[in-house]
């Protein structure tokens, strides 16, 4: 029975594959305030309050995505600027107060649907910002984008149920305890086989698609009617570009699909984990 399932690992992987926007950073000496970037200075109209913690400490720009520069991906905006800020003054671990983080106190996600590109209307004096010693990167990086297909991590909280719903053998009812145990072991064997083939292909910086994990999927513990199942941003540790989340970790931002459709970024799930 296992050999039959083992031969369908690739078929299963192809059935659940999703497109994402792959992000490739590059070193640059100069960026505009409104272009896509990791780190650096943000686009902010002068009449906008700079994002702060409740104690009044300025947050630092982690990433800025200008959707006029990205390929089109279903559910993501086709225009506007989306920003991710985190507390980087050393008071928290990359802006995380609790795991996972929903309160936008030590991080912030801000969306500008109609950017004003008149430089005279934009904040250009950031001398008030303290050094970003708690950022996972030290330099401002420009970003290139491309569409890429991504596989789901076996650590994804939805993965086990997807395996069961995909194969008819797991959908029988009125099973004995021994049969249920045997089928669960079969799922375990299938997951192990999948991980051997696909887990090393996961990771990287991206928008959309599936997240990668270095530990558990924190979303499994949330008690909400709707899951945080859309990956807004993933930023990986990246030696080439001096990005490091602790010990080879990864930072992820998730949103509920219904909130994304409304372009409501007030409730975003932020997670960070390292090896």
Where are these regions (language model features)?
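Preference for intrinsically disordered or flexible, low-complexity segments
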Residues: 1-275
